[in-house]
A protein has these predicted regions:
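Substrate-access "cap/lid" subdomains that shape
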Residues: 53, 60, 64, 71, ...
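Short glycine-enriched nucleophile-adjacent loop
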Residues: 81-96
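Alpha/beta-hydrolase fold catalytic core
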Residues: 235-285, 292-298
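Mobile gating loops/cap/lid regions near enzyme active sites that modulate substrate access
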Residues: 275, 279-324
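Catalytic lobes of large eukaryotic enzymes
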Residues: 226-252, 311-323
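Active-site rim elements
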Residues: 40-45, 111-117, 181, 255-268, ...
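Conserved alpha/beta-hydrolase "nucleophile elbow" surrounding the catalytic nucleophile
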Residues: 77-78
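Cap/lid segment of the alpha/beta-hydrolase catalytic domain
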Residues: 1-52, 60-64
C-alpha cells in the first residue's frame, strides 16, 4: 500500500512502515530436513519471523521518527491479513511476548481459515522442489539443504509455477503457530486477550473476491486438478471436507472448474474465516464498537475493461486505491 495521498492530501498524521519479508519458497518452505536442521524447533515460518523482528524494531525505534510506540496499527491485505492474524495469535499465546506491540488490527480480504498444514503435510512440496532441481531423494536432509542453497534465487523463483505444489504458506510448527489454534478461539481465550489489551479490529472484503481467485492458479477441468489446487491452500483432510459442501461441475469446460475453485477459495480464505473471527470476538464479549466490518461493492471508474473485464466485478485487491 502507498499512503502518499492519505498523508499528503488526506491529512493522515502517521508514520507508515512497510515491512519487507521473505516470501514463497524463501519464507515458507517446510519439511523434515528443515525440522532436523533446527533441532526440532522453528521450521517453515521464516517470513513470519521476519515480520516479528520488524514489529519489535518498530516498537523500539519508531519514536525516533516521530511515531508513538503505544499507538501502532498492524495492517495487511490478502496474505498480509493472514499474517496480521498470525502475529496476533503468536502474541496472545506467548507468555513472554511484549504486550504493547500494536493497538489495532486491519485485515483486508483474508483470515486464517483452518489449522495450517504441519511440516509433515508439506513434505511432498519439499520433495518436489528437490526433484525439480535434480537433487537425489536418497541424499540426507543436510545434503539436500546444501544443494538447495547452491541454487540461485532467480532459478528458485522461476521454478515455482512449474511445480504442482506451488503455493508456500505458513505451517503449524509448534513454535510460531501452535496446534489447536481454533480451540484457543472457541474457549474464549483469544477474545479475552483481545479485550484485555483493549484492541480494535477493522476487517472486510470486496464483493466479488472469487473472480480473481478463479483465474489465479485455477484447475484444469477435472476433479483431480481441483483437489491438487485446493491442497496448495489446505491440508488434504480439509480439502476433502470442503468438497463435500459444493456442487461440482459435470462439464469439461475449464471455466466451470475455475469458477468453483474461485468460489471455494474465496469462501475459505475470506468470507467464512473472517465472519468466524468477528462472531467469535462478539460472542465472547468484545464490544461491537471495537469491531468494524466493511464490504466494498463499488468498482472505481478508472478500473476499465483494459485493466480488468467488467465480468470480474469488484474483485480481490481492486479496493487497493481506496486505502491510499
Amino acid at each position: 500500500m502507498n499512503p502518499t495521498e492519505l498523508i499528503s492530501t488526506g491529512g493522515l498524521n502517521a508514520v507508515w512502515v512497510s515491512v519487507g519479508y521473505r516470501l514463497s519458497v524463501f519464507g515458507f518452505l517446510a519439511g523434515e530436513a528443515l525440522r532436523d536442521e533446527s533441532h526440532g524447533k522453528e521450521v517453515g515460518n521464516y517470513g513470519l519471523w521476519d515480520q516479528r523482528l520488524a514489529l519489535e524494531w518498530v516498537s523500539e525505534n519508531i519514536a525516533a521518527f516521530g511515531g508513538d510506540p503505544h499507538n501502532i496499527t498492524l495492517a495487511g491485505r490478502s496474505a498480509g491479513a493472514y499474517a496480521v492474524q498470525a502475529q496476533a495469535l503468536y502474541d496472545f499465546q506467548k507468555a513472554d511476548a511484549p504486550k504493547d506491540l500494536f493497538r489495532r488490527l486491519m485485515m483486508h480480504s483474508n483470515s486464517i481459515p483452518t489449522q495450517p498444514k504441519s511440516p509433515e503435510d508439506c513434505q511432498p512440496q519439499f520433495d518436489e522442489v528437490c526433484q525439480y532441481f535434480g537433487i537425489p531423494s536418497e541424499y540426507s536432509g543436510q545434503e539436500k539443504m546444501r544443494k538447495l542453497r547452491q541454487i540461485s534465487a532467480q532459478d528458485l523463483t522461476d521454478a515455482i509455477m512449474n511445480l504442482d505444489h506451488h503455493t508456500f504458506r505458513p505451517v503449524t510448527d509448534g513454535v510460531f503457530i501452535h496446534p489447536g489454534i481454533f480451540d484457543f478461539y472457541r474457549n474464549g481465550e483469544f477474545a479475552a486477550e483481545f479485550k484485555r489489551r483493549d484492541l480494535r479490529l477493522y476487517i472486510g472484503e470486496v464483493l466479488n473476491e472469487d473472480t480473481l481467485y478463479a483465474i489465479t492458479n485455477g484447475p484444469e477441468a477435472s476433479l483431480d486438478s481441483l483437489k491438487l489446487q485446493l491442497t496448495n491452500y489446505y491440508p488434504p483432510s480439509t480439502t476433502a471436507r470442503l468438497l463435500q459442501h459444493y456442487s461440482l461441475p459435470t462439464s469439461t469446460d475449464k471455466k466451470d472448474w475455475q469458477d468453483i475453485f474461485g468460489r471455494i477459495v474465496a469462501d475459505g480464505q475470506v468470507r467464512a474465516p473472517y465472519r468466524f473471527l468477528v462472531n467469535n470476538l462478539l460472542s465472547h464479549g468484545v464490544d461491537i464498537q471495537n469491531v468494524w466490518r466493511y464490504c466494498i461493492a463499488y468498482r472505481l471508474s478508472f478500473i476499465t475493461e483494459k485493466v480488468a473485464p467488467a465480468s470480474m466485478g469488484v474483485s480481490h485487491s481492486m479496493d487497493r486505491p481506496l486505502w491510499k
